[in-house]
């Protein structure tokens, strides 16, 4: 079986993930909730993860890395926080509902213009079509890194380069 929806529900957790979750459940408190040993230990684990993620992403400041409970909430926060009334946003037909629903709501409620780049018969993003849509004056390009429907991977470095060249932000669903 080929299973492409790991972002939603990983079919089988690797043993190292199971071990880490069990260890955390048995020893850590709630980060930022107090001065108990468990709470302080949890805070150290979270901050260590934040520093590792910042290094992985090339982020100069770890305190600029924010965690969310899940990808849907993170995408909703990013999209709703960045897109303003009347803005123009470019996305793709490959996107998941965690991108499409907030964008459609913003279009209906805030007058945001949402334009979608298509894909070819094999489900690959039409980069030439995307390039035609990404023009100066857009607020953001919102794109998935890999489709959980087709399994195709999007060249997000190229998409980010297009977005930044047009003066736009780039939001990537990398879940």
Whereabouts are the PLM-identified features?
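Pyridoxal 5′-phosphate
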Residues: 1-175
């Amino acid at each position: 079986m080929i299973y492409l929806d790991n972002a939603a529900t990983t079919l089988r957790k690797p043993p190292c993930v199971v071990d880490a979750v069990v260890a955390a459940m048995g020893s850590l408190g709630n980060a930022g909730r107090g001065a108990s040993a468990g709470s302080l230990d949890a805070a150290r684990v979270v901050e260590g993860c934040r520093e590792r993620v910042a290094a992985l992403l090339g982020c100069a400041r770890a305190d600029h890395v924010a965690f969310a409970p899940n990808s849907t909430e993170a995408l909703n926060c990013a999209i709703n926080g960045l897109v303003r009334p009347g803005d123009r946003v470019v996305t793709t037909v490959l996107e998941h509902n965690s991108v499409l629903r907030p964008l459609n709501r913003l279009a209906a409620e805030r007058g945001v213009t949402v334009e979608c780049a298509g894909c070819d018969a094999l489900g690959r993003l039409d980069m030439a079509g995307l390039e035609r849509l990404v023009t100066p004056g857009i607020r953001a390009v919102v794109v998935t890194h890999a489709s959980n429907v087709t399994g195709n991977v999007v060249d997000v470095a190229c998409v980010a380069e297009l977005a930044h060249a047009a003066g736009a932000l780039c939001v990537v669903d990398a879940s």
